[in-house]
Amino acid sequence: MVRITRCGAVTALVALLVAGLSGCGSVAGTAVPGEIDVRTLDVGDFPVDRFSYPQEAGDHGVLLEGIRMSEAVVTSSQVDPSLKFGRGSKVLPDPATAVDFLANVSQPILENRRMVVGYAASGADQGDPEGQVRPTSDATAIQVVALRFPDTGSAATAAEELEAADIGVSPDNRKLESEKYPQALLHWRPGIANIGAFLAHEEFVISLFVQRPAADSADLVSWADRALTAQLDQLARFEPTPTADIADLAVDPENLLARVVVADRESHEPDPDQFAVYGRNYLINSADDQPARARLLDESGFERTAYAAGSSVARVRDPAGAPVLVNGFIESAGPAYDPMPAPEDVPGVKCLELNSSGDPERQYRYRCFVPYKRYVGVVSSDDETEIRQKTAAQYALLANSL
């Protein structure tokens, strides 16, 4: 299903925050033959004229590179199709954040070896229990982290030191070896059904944590091998930005963020949840059925998604893919949402309304999907008037941006 929530990490086309707006406004733009005149739409106070954000990253270049690294880390279903339940992913912009996915004693190592940035993703073969943030003991679960360092020497040293620190957490920890990856550093605690691993690869350190239902060291090593194979293949397809150029990364080079309807265009800066552009793996990592999500993205020709202040816009390869993406997200919305009539004056829109089985404290009451040529906008609100204005505004902004 598509998680449609008020809080937490942004998941597939999910809004985190919606500003409260009311009133009516006029719409800039021009009529295009064969299309509606967007100047006739009621867009409230939302700005809908063509726009571009400042491209300078300022102090946020590392964060932008971390967002790019969402495509450098493998999804769990790429490791094994049974691991279809995505448990999310996260940018690791600094050592303090990275130790959420490593032993706490690792932070000085990351600082001393000048960690540049990282990314983490996890998944399992079953969903987490309701209200829990960890898999059950009978689940197979995997966490993959890629950490970048200034050079290959720093990465190699960091891998050795991270392994030494991790294995030193308990006197019962023991080293393991991989025949397939003899350079990998593996360890486990006999009788405990999980394994940790580190592998230096070029300027990266790959960190793994694999949980299995049974404490079998040979089985755990085989799963570590499987994960390393998939992750190395994924990393080979990623082109890191040269360290000297990270500060010069553009915030919105394809003007995709500028196509997302927002109440206020001021004071936006790169943020992994509230102001970012992601590729396909980010959406897959949040899916409860990763293979199905991957098929949808492939079938629709999905390219990228931009998130800005609670709304989002996805771009697909050609206009035929936009309704495919809309229908796929509608179908995966889950039982808490029912179809509702969409605004008749906005072509192609489909909307959902929260039903009695939903949680209004966590889920928005209304959500609409707005296709326009190669783009799909997604907007949410708890107010019926606002959702209609916001839907119209998203359509108008997409039309005016071409």
Q: Language-model features: where?
A:
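Bacterial N-terminal signal peptides that target proteins for export
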Residues: 1-12
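C-terminal motif of bacterial Sec signal peptides marking the signal peptidase cleavage site
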Residues: 19-23
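N-terminal "mature-domain start" segment
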Residues: 25-134, 221-307, 335-342, 390-402
